[in-house]
């Protein structure tokens, strides 16, 4: 059963919020609170969000990323057991420019769990930060011999 917040989530899409508030929480508060566990906790948070907001296909990822304010996601390759995406946009550029070690594990975990839910196979995702190209590459892989 959905909580009242989850039931009203669609209404939140219409409210505009500045990136400053979002980045304060994501890039200052959470790393300070979680310390060395920040990266792994963000990955698991992404997986948790994917279970709360399951999508029908990976083609829906870009729209979700836009609505969530995570940036512009583009599929760049699709293989039998691997998908590769590029994540870019103003919020990504800012993070790449000003963070010594920017973390995109929330997005990686979200993609991994979505693929795992869709394929019923264990999936893992990882990030590659491309500072010069001003983008992040997110790769998800799964093994057909490794069912959930």
Swiss-Prot record:
Transmembrane domains' residue ranges: none
Signal peptide: none
Gene3D superfamilies noted in UniProt: Trafficking protein particle complex subunit 3
Alphabetized InterPro entries for the sequence: DUF2507, NO_sig/Golgi_transp_ligand-bd
Pfam families documented for this protein: DUF2507
Highest taxon of source: Bacteria
Protein name in the entry: Uncharacterized protein YslB
Gene source species: Bacillus subtilis (strain 168)
Gene name for this UniProt entry: yslB
């Amino acid at each position: 059963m959905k909580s009242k917040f989850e039931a009203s989530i669609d209404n939140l899409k219409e409210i505009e919020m500045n990136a400053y508030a979002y980045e304060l929480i994501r890039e200052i508060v959470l790393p300070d609170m979680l310390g060395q566990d920040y990266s792994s906790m963000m990955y698991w948070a992404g997986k948790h969000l994917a279970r709360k907001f399951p999508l029908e296909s990976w083609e829906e990822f870009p729209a979700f990323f836009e609505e969530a304010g995570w940036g512009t996601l583009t599929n760049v390759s699709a293989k039998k057991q691997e998908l590769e995406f590029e994540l870019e946009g103003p919020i990504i550029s800012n993070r790449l420019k000003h963070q010594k070690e920017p973390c995109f594990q929330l997005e990686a975990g979200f993609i991994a769990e979505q693929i795992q839910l869709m394929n019923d196979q264990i999936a893992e995702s990882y990030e590659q930060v491309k500072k010069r190209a001003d983008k992040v590459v997110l790769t998800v892989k799964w093994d057909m011999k490794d069912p959930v």
